[in-house]
Curated annotation (Swiss-Prot):
Induction: By dark.
Tissue specificity statement from the Swiss-Prot or TrEMBL entry: Expressed in stems and siliques.
Xref: Gene3D superfamilies: 3.30.70.260
Cysteine pairs bridged by disulfides in the record: none
Alphabetized GO MF terms: amino acid binding
CDD domains reported in the protein's UniProt record: ACT_ACR_1 (cd04895), ACT_ACR_3 (cd04897)
Protein name: ACT domain-containing protein ACR5
Keyword entries, A-Z: Repeat
ACT domain segment(s): 39-115, 130-207, 271-347, 349-432
Role played: May bind amino acids.
Pfam family, one: ACT_ACR9_3rd
Length: 456
């Protein structure tokens, strides 16, 4: 059986390589045809998931997709993307342009190469251990997790943490404090898993939430972080309505995405219409969700030239059928809304840049805690000997952060180290009777414990 399976996989790979040789992928980058955007055209043989790979390449370069026209019905894949850089200008950096050509073109390292489809966006490494966490969102969770890892002589090299509807998900890359390499001792890995599991369990008492999950594994089989966070949230069913009505989100100042799904019976398509506030990586989040739910995007039109984004998808199941029932239709709508909202972070954006050291993340979250700040989302990166961390913060009641509080924190951490980016968002506090919803804040007074989740 193993021989047969191996033979089958090798044949599929050889067939894919033959198709690429006969019809190699083609990428054209045009900076002349449009005044304000760079136009990227991609043609290739079609394959399920290719659209996601292309969108991922563009979003990982921090490019903004202003418009897109997608056609991948049948055996050919043809896309046009109008993109700008982070500053809203045409993409003129030749290093970036060459990376796009290499990643989307006929090169063997291209996302169209069969060997690269499952690894794009993943840095194969044995230099760190991957920790995946899901559980109930509650006050002080991040600080407690960081404290446990520090006590276990683990250094957090990179991390990303999301919260949504009283759920928390995190993907952390950690190393041994002494050797700065991956942790391989089975007993130590088991201890890390066990103690982190205890921390995650601490906030679920008395509420109807799923059991927390902790996974500690080698980085060799690591999934792209954004994909994994979506999958962790999806597996924890954050798209379901929990004990409070989903309409409460409007009362908390959130803007609910407008998503509709209908069938075009004459052509056996289902049409997905999305209207919501535009933001970075929005297209990736929606395309990933549809792909991960085993839908094929046959045609699509994307318009995000203004503050609102409009997305229209013509989809089918991988078996060629449209959405088959009202229950399935509602599930697609719920899952897309959840995917859009998971990455949204209201609050004041803080960026920390300083020399990296063991325990830095623990110290920073402790300072936030001592000043009664709540972090709604965090991204931790290490580049060389530098730590580059981003936090979205609010005060304990969900209101805008007081300027004096921020300045006090900057005095402690260092004004050149901690920078304020953007302004506070206007947001209402969560209802008093909603489930606890701060992943990261630890409050000075226990009287704040019953405040609810403030997210959007």
């Amino acid at each position: 059986m193993d021989v047969c399976l191996s033979y089958s996989y090798n044949m599929d790979d050889e067939i894919a390589k033959f198709i690429r040789r006969v019809n190699p992928p083609r990428v054209v980058i045009d900076n002349e045809v449009c005044k304000d955007v760079t136009v990227i055209k991609v043609d290739s043989a079609n394959k399920h998931g290719i659209l996601l790979e292309v969108v991922q390449v563009l979003t990982e370069l921090n490019l903004t997709i202003k418009k897109a026209y997608i056609s991948s019905d049948g055996g050919w894949f043809m896309d046009v993307f109008n993109v700008t850089d982070q500053d809203g200008n045409k993409v003129t950096d030749e290093i970036v342009l060459e990376y796009i050509r290499k990643s989307l073109g006929p090169d063997e390292s291209s996302c169209f190469s069969p060997s690269m489809r499952s690894t794009i966006g993943v840095k194969q490494s044995v230099d760190y251990t991957v920790v995946e966490l899901t559980g109930t969102d509650r006050p002080g969770l991040l600080s407690e997790l960081c404290a446990v890892l520090m006590d276990l002589q683990c250094n957090v090299v990179n991390a990303e943490i999301w919260t949504h509807r009283a759920k928390a998900a995190a993907v952390l890359q950690v190393t041994d404090e002494e050797t700065c390499s991956a942790i391989t001792d089975p007993e130590r890995l088991s201890k890390i898993r066990k103690l982190l599991g205890y921390v995650l369990t601490g906030g679920s008492s008395g509420r109807r939430f799923r059991e927390p999950k902790t996974t500690v594994s080698s980085a060799l089989n690591e999934t792209h972080t954004d994909r994994k966070l979506h999958q962790l949230m999806f597996a924890d069913r954050d798209y379901d309505e929990w004990e409070n009505n989903v309409d409460d989100e409007d009362k908390c100042g959130r803007v609910i995405p407008d998503v509709d799904v209908s069938n075009l019976h004459d052509l056996d398509y289902s049409i997905v219409m999305i209207k919501c506030k535009d933001r970075p990586k929005l297209l990736f989040d929606t395309v990933f969700t549809l792909t991960d739910m085993n839908y094929v995007v046959s045609h699509a039109s994307i318009d995000a030239e203004g503050p609102q984004a409009y997305q229209e998808y013509y989809i089918r199941h991988t078996d060629g059928s449209p959405v088959k029932s009202e229950a399935e239709r509602q599930r697609v709508i719920k899952c897309l809304k959840a995917a859009i909202q998971r990455r949204v972070s209201e609050g004041l954006k803080l960026e920390l840049c300083t020399s990296d050291r063991v325990g830095l993340l623990s110290d920073v979250t402790r300072i936030f805690r001592e000043n009664s700040l709540t972090v709604t989302r965090a991204e931790v990166k290490t580049k060389g000997d530098k730590a580059l961390n981003t936090f979205y913060v609010r005060d304990a009641s969900g209101y805008q952060v007081d300027t004096k509080t921020i300045e006090s924190i900057r005095q402690v951490i260092g004004q050149t180290i901690l920078q304020v980016k953007g302004g506070n968002t206007d947001a209402k506090p969560s209802p008093q009777d909603s489930p606890t919803g701060f992943l990261f804040g630890v409050f000075k007074s226990r009287s704040f414990v019953n405040f609810g989740l403030i997210r959007s």
